[in-house]
Regions:
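Catalytic-site signature of metal-activated, phosphate-bearing donor transferases
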Residues: 2-8, 70, 95-248
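Active-site nucleotide-sugar/metal-binding loop of Leloir-type enzymes
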Residues: 70-83
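Cell-envelope/extracellular polymer assembly enzymes that use nucleotide-activated donors
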Residues: 22-24
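Short, well-formed alpha-helical segments that are part of the catalytic scaffolds
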Residues: 6-15, 31-45, 52
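A short, glycine-/small-residue-rich helix N-cap motif at loop->alpha-helix starts
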Residues: 59-69
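Short beta-strand-to-loop acidic/aromatic patch adjacent to the donor-nucleotide binding site
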Residues: 81-94
């Protein structure tokens, strides 16, 4: 089920010099529904509204990512989005995004902005060794006709690969809360290994998600916090494959 909340457009006299670009956030939720209120508080300062897909009625291990994204992209376009911000309930943007959003969305043409994807291993520290220090999430992009998107893989981009999108980096941080709890790291590894046993969608596989060999952490800089602060509940936030094994 799709729900949305779109802020009223500014009066025309306030946008005579330059029309404000409308940024609509899109996300879906299921096992992480309880994280949505804090997500909305996090993104409210820099979006013009949001569209959400309530996936809690699903019964399988993992519902159709392609189908959910198609619905969200179309709903955002119908809501008048110039730009789309794709996010998950367990992600938080640094507060500086609010001051930078206007400049980011001023760029012409098809652009996908990449954020430094910081995998938190504690509420205030993220991992930086190896692959962990170089992750980029291109999640702010120009709105487009969802019919252009034909990708079907588990980890596909939100925007079409061969449609002229320029991938740029904004240097801002996007913090991922899911990896804070060690149990979730293992559960995430197991879930993706179950969904992609032949590694067709990710050649390196998923064991690295729970491998702490050589772990190096870096504290979130004092001038780059996210808001609101996160208090971890220790929940799994995803399908528990142990339940599936028990039922079998």
């Amino acid at each position: 089920m799709i729900s949305s909340e779109i802020k009223p457009k500014l009066p025309r006299w306030k946008t005579l010099l330059r029309r404000k670009q409308r940024v609509i956030a899109v996300f879906s939720y299921r096992f992480d529904a309880h994280l949505v209120p804090d997500l909305l508080a996090n993104i409210d300062p820099f979006v013009d509204g949001w569209v959400a897909f309530d996936d809690r009625a699903s019964t399988g291990v993992f519902s159709s990512e392609v189908g959910r994204r198609r619905c969200l992209l179309e709903a955002a376009r119908q809501a008048g989005a110039d730009w789309i911000l794709a996010v998950d309930p367990d992600e938080r943007f640094e507060v500086a995004v609010a001051a930078e959003m206007s400049d980011l969305t001023r760029m012409k043409g098809r652009i996908a902005w990449g954020f430094n994807f910081r995998e938190l291993y504690a509420p205030l520290s993220y991992r930086i060794d190896g692959i962990w220090g170089s992750k980029i999430r291109h999640c702010l992009f120009r709105a487009f006709d969802p019919a252009e998107r034909t990708d079907t893989g588990l980890h596909d981009l939100w925007y079409p690969r061969n449609a002229g999108f320029r991938e740029l980096r904004c240097g801002l941080n996007l913090y991922h809360l899911k990896m804070i709890d060690p149990a979730r790291r293992g559960a995430r590894r197991d879930l993706y290994s179950f969904l992609d046993p032949d590694r067709r969608d990710q050649a390196i596989g998923y064991d690295y998600l729970a491998d702490e060999t050589g772990v190096q952490l870096e504290p979130i800089p004092a001038d780059r916090p996210y808001h609101p602060p996160h208090v971890d509940d220790g929940g799994l936030w995803m399908f528990d494959l142990r339940d599936k094994a028990g039922a079998a």
